[in-house]
């Protein structure tokens, strides 16, 4: 399945179609959208975003704890969409504050 992923970035909103077996960060890059990242392995906070609505699968990530995930934190480099989603990007400073 392919889902609509809306990214709310500091530069504005952007919408892309992301298959459910492709990481959101990877698809964004393919479409020329510049998102922050570092490790690309789900083990740091560089790519962190906040899930506004929808459902993702980020079981590959190892950085966020259960409480953070319940609060809606998402690592875009290790997140697959499981429904149409809206994510606020560029949130690392807020997460690590």
From Swiss-Prot:
GO molecular function: 2 iron, 2 sulfur cluster binding; electron transfer activity; metal ion binding
Domain 2Fe-2S ferredoxin-type stretches: 3-93
Any Pfam family the entry gives: Fer2
Cofactor: [2Fe-2S] cluster
Keyword vocabulary terms for this entry: 2Fe-2S, Chloroplast, Electron transport, Iron, Iron-sulfur, Metal-binding, Plastid, Transport
Free-text function comment from the UniProt entry: Ferredoxins are iron-sulfur proteins that transfer electrons in a wide variety of metabolic reactions.
Keyword Plastid: yes
Binding site for [2Fe-2S] cluster: 39, 44, 47, 77
Protein family according to the UniProt entry: Belongs to the 2Fe2S plant-type ferredoxin family.
Chain segments annotated as coiled-coil in the UniProt record: none
Compartment annotation: Plastid, Chloroplast
The protein, known as: Ferredoxin
InterPro entries with a match to the protein in the record: 2Fe-2S_ferredoxin-like_sf, 2Fe-2S_ferredoxin-type, 2Fe2S_fd_BS, Beta-grasp_dom_sf, Fd_pln
Gene Ontology cellular component annotations, sorted alphabetically: chloroplast stroma
GO biological process: electron transport chain; ferredoxin metabolic process
Species lineage: Eukaryota, Viridiplantae, Streptophyta, Embryophyta, Tracheophyta
Cofactor note: Binds 1 [2Fe-2S] cluster.
